[in-house]
């Protein structure tokens, strides 16, 4: 059998292999009948063990680069790699090489005996674009075959050089990958060929349907060391998978769903990565390169390895688009800054935290220069887009949340452009949140918005007093936010010192009540009265309250106390007993009004008043009873003979023999939707209504220290009696029930102060059925 050496495409073989073959030629061209017995892996250099002679053997050491070229899986395999070439004789005739058919047969038989037991396959060594090497010249490992960079598919163990065909469809590729991944999961060491899925087609494949659930679990199985270069993943779903040490070079991941997909230690250079809008959670890149890869504007690049860009042109996208460089990555930009483009590319507050701003900013600080350069290109694009103030208004918050922070503030170009944006943003915040509570600040708000507001107050100190509602909220959240930095807290404390020194504020803090009692705030405890809000109408009026009180009044619960503050006029504490909270909040401190009204609408005591005192028949009394629920103390008293007689006329029909009439009882059940409720639930409601009427009869509202309206005392006692009939278990004891009843009627020498009875009953209800009490008792009495 004659094989011409010219059939081998030497230009495609690595340089060290060229040297090896050249050396063989040099030592045989002079007619020596040399027998090349082996070329083994040793630590010797290429030319160290060369013996020449008519019948001597020639042994070559394999350099490290050639070892790497064969890609053995481990060191043990590497040491067993062997190239055997037998009976090569140079005829000195135009480079022709004669290998006898007998020797070829012997070599193939020996090769098959050696490897079939281990693998049942043979891999011929191929070079990309070249014909096979001569028969009998093969590359293998003693335990398992290896494949060169040419990645030739396996061939059957026969004399034929015909190769097995590639998978012909995405389904076939998926089946092949499933087989390889499961073998790897089972602990089998895969060869490079087993892990070679270059030029694969996974279009429209949902990987969760072809892989076990363990690959989609958190900290689950990993697809490791696979080569997916130049492959197609268009419209596939690789969500929740973890690819480690994989190669995706030149692959297309267009409209791929990759929610929570993790790429680690991988090569994703020159990839077209445009993941689907149905991707819910962004993919992550950990120690992964993305050179010249096109990235969507909503990616998280926190773990990417960035390099200096080369001179490559921007990628070609069928839909068109502009691009900016982020290191060696390409970021997509809109062709025009339309309203939709502004929202989609810049408004991460409207798009689940995703925008080109957040994509650039997601890189670690070690890439600050690259981040600033990319942001400058973005600002140039926005400036060139000639956006109006109205066009930028919806994304002002998103813009300042990134560009008003280092390292971007170090850029003169960015600072000049963002300054008026920040001023408009601050003006809008003052207008919106001086009279209403700020939204509960999450991590994003604490770390990105609060520092911007502090900076804005620092630039415009007059706003501290003109908008003290907003200013105090900002300081409150800076001092209490768990995600605020120490730097933010320190700046907030320093700004508050400036605020306290203002002439409109300082008169209110030297009264022995503020902060640590000497005019300075005490930030070591939330119980200290550190906060001072100025009235929006009267410069002489202020409210002093603690951190805890301010927090709960801005975000109230049914148990919130609405009188746990000092009301100051000219620095002096004044009583709030006869001040309606709702009027105080409406006139002076509107920041609390919406929250107070929202809680007030959940209190349903007024429904019973409307049953007893209809506006058609008793309009004046109805207004007096309702007005009394808006303050802790009333100046209106109903103990004169005319008032007592009028009340008796109204309440006596409801209390035949001192008990609730059946008809009136049913009206109460209907008004409070208790017709089908359990006796205990009915009893709890009646008990709480009784506490309210006990308060009506006390000196705080319609009674005096020595007298109270009998009709109101009797009605309160009748409500309590009915509650006892329905469910004695809700009372502390029968003795306590009897004591309360005696106090209502002044029997057996009991102290008749209904204010004491009301307080005692209220404490019991708050302890054992607080939600019922909170749904009935007026806020001002809570």
UniProtKB/Swiss-Prot annotation:
Residue ranges the record marks as coiled coil: none
Keyword Ligase among record annotations: no
EC number: 2.3.2.26
Pfam families hit by this protein: SopA (PF13981), SopA_C (PF13979)
Single Gene Ontology MF annotation: ubiquitin-protein transferase activity
Subcellular location(s) of the protein: Secreted; Host cell
Catalytic activity reported: S-ubiquitinyl-[E2 ubiquitin-conjugating enzyme]-L-cysteine + [acceptor protein]-L-lysine = [E2 ubiquitin-conjugating enzyme]-L-cysteine + N(6)-ubiquitinyl-[acceptor protein]-L-lysine
InterPro entries given in the database record: SopA-like_cat, SopA-like_catalytic_sf, SopA-like_central
Catalytic residue positions: 753 (glycyl thioester intermediate)
Post-translational modification: Ubiquitinated in the presence of host E1 ubiquitin-activating enzyme, E2 ubiquitin-conjugating enzyme and ubiquitin.
Keyword Lipoprotein recorded: no
Keywords: Secreted, Transferase, Ubl conjugation, Ubl conjugation pathway, Virulence
Top-level EC class as recorded in UniProt: transferase
Gene Ontology cellular-component terms listed: extracellular region; host cell
Protein purpose: Effector proteins function to alter host cell physiology and promote bacterial survival in host tissues. This protein is an E3 ubiquitin ligase that interferes with host's ubiquitination pathway.
Family: Belongs to the SopA E3 ligase family.
Name of the protein in question: E3 ubiquitin-protein ligase SopA
Species annotation: Salmonella choleraesuis (strain SC-B67)
């Amino acid at each position: 059998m004659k094989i011409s050496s010219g059939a081998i495409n030497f230009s495609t073989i690595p340089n060290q292999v060229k040297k090896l073959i050249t050396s063989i030629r040099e030592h045989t061209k002079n007619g020596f009948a040399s027998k090349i017995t082996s070329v083994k892996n040793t630590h010797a250099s290429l030319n160290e063990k060369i013996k020449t002679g008519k019948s001597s053997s020639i042994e070559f050491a394999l350099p490290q680069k050639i070892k790497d070229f064969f890609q053995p899986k481990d060191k043990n395999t590497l040491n067993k790699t062997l190239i055997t070439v037998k009976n090569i004789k140079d005829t000195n005739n135009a480079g022709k090489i004669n290998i006898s058919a007998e020797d070829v047969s012997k070599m193939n038989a020996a090769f098959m005996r050696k490897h079939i037991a281990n693998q049942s396959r043979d891999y011929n060594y191929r070079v990309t674009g070249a014909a096979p090497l001569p028969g009998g010249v093969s590359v293998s490992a003693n335990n398992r075959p290896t494949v060169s960079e040419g990645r030739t598919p396996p061939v059957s163990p026969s004399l034929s050089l015909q190769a097995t065909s590639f998978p012909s469809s995405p389904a076939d590729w998926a089946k092949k990958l499933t087989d390889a991944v499961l073998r790897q999961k089972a602990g089998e060491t895969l060869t490079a060929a087993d892990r070679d899925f270059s030029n694969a087609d996974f279009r429209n494949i949902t990987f969760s349907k072809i892989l076990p659930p363990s690959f989609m679990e958190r900290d689950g199985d990993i697809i490791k060391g696979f080569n997916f270069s130049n492959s197609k993943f268009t419209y596939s779903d690789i969500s929740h998978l973890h690819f480690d040490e994989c190669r995706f070079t030149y692959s297309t991941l267009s409209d791929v769903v990759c929610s929570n997909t993790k790429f680690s230690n991988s090569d994703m250079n020159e990839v077209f990565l445009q993941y689907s809008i149905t991707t819910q959670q962004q993919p992550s890149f950990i120690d992964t390169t993305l050179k010249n890869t096109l990235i969507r504007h909503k990616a998280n690049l926190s773990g990417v390895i960035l390099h200096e860009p080369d001179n490559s042109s921007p990628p070609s996208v069928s839909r068109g688009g502009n691009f900016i460089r982020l290191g060696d990555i390409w970021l997509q930009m809109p062709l025009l800054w339309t309203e939709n483009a502004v929202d989609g590319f810049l408004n991460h507050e409207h798009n689940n935290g995703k925008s080109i701003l957040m994509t650039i900013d997601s890189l670690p600080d070690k890439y600050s220069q690259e981040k600033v350069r990319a942001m400058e290109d973005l600002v140039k694009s926005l400036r060139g887009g000639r956006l109006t103030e109205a066009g930028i208004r919806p994304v002002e918050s998103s813009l300042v949340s990134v560009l008003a922070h280092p390292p971007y503030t170090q850029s003169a170009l960015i600072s000049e452009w963002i300054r008026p944006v920040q001023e408009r943003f601050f003006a809008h915040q003052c207008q919106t949140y001086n009279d209403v509570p700020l939204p509960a600040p999450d991590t994003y708000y604490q770390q990105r918005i609060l520092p911007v507001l502090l900076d804005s107050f620092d630039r415009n100190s007059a706003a501290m007093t003109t908008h003290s509602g907003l200013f105090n909220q900002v300081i409150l959240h800076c001092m209490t936010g768990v995600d605020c930095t120490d730097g933010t807290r320190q700046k907030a404390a320093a700004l508050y010192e400036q605020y306290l020194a203002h002439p409109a504020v300082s008169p209110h803090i030297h009264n022995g009540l503020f902060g640590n009692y000497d005019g300075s705030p005490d930030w070591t405890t939330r119980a200290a009265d550190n906060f001072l809000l100025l009235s929006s109408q009267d410069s002489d009026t202020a409210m002093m309250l603690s951190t805890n009180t301010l927090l709960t009044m801005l975000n109230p619960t049914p148990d919130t106390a609405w009188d746990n503050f000092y009301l100051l006029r000219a620095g002096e504490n004044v009583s709030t007993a006869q001040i309606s909270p709702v009027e105080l909040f409406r006139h002076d401190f509107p920041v609390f009004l919406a929250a107070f009204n929202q809680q007030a609408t959940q209190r349903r005591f007024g429904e019973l008043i409307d049953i007893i005192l209809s506006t058609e028949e008793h309009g004046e009394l109805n207004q007096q009873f309702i007005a009394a629920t808006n303050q802790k103390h009333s100046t209106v008293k109903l103990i004169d003979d005319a008032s007592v007689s009028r009340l008796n006329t109204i309440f006596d029909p409801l209390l035949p023999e001192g008990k609730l009439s059946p008809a009136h009882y049913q009206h109460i059940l209907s008004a409070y939707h208790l017709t089908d409720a359990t006796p205990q639930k009915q009893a709890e409601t009646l008990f709480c209504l009784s506490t309210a009427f006990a308060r009506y009869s006390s000196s705080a509202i319609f009674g005096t220290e020595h007298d109270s309206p009998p009709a109101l005392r009797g009605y309160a006692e009748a409500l309590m009696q009915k509650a006892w009939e329905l469910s004695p278990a809700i009372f502390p004891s029968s003795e306590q029930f009897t004591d309360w009843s005696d106090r209502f009627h002044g029997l057996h020498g009991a102290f008749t102060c209904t204010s004491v009875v009301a307080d005692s009953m209220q404490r019991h209800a708050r302890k054992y059925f607080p939600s019922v009490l909170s749904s009935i008792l007026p806020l001002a009495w809570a």
